[in-house]
Amino acid sequence: MGFAMRMNFVDVVVSDSLKHYYVDGKKMGYQFDIRLSYYRGHFLSVIDEFKVKVDDFEVPAERIKFCINGKEFSPVEFDKCYTEFWRVIEPATIKVIYPGGLPEGEHKIDVTLFFRSPYMPIGPDHRYMPVDSCGTKTMAITDKGGKENVLCR
């Protein structure tokens, strides 16, 4: 991607949010929260690029669930989510299907998130201002805690 506007309002990856999630008592993966680093919310349909890397390993899109408004979406569904609004004050939970979870310790989380601002046209042919809402954070995960099932917010 060429030029993209960047506004650093918040850390994209929410501190201390990395944890395992369980389904029927079995560790099925891990999750963490992200925020939109922008001054207003947007519909999921304006997200043009979304990727997750953990410890420099790119997570396949089919293993990612983007949880918001009590619903789960795969990144390949974003273009159809024109009624799902991500409020700027609400974090989204990113669930990664990874049976057995991550090993205990620190892990580097990289989120690539580019969206277009639909009220900022920058040229002909329905082109809009791209916005960079990417983020990186190193967080620790432990096996301490419950084995409760985790639902989307």
Describe every region a protein language model picked out.
Residues 1-153:
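Terminal leader/tail segments of proteins
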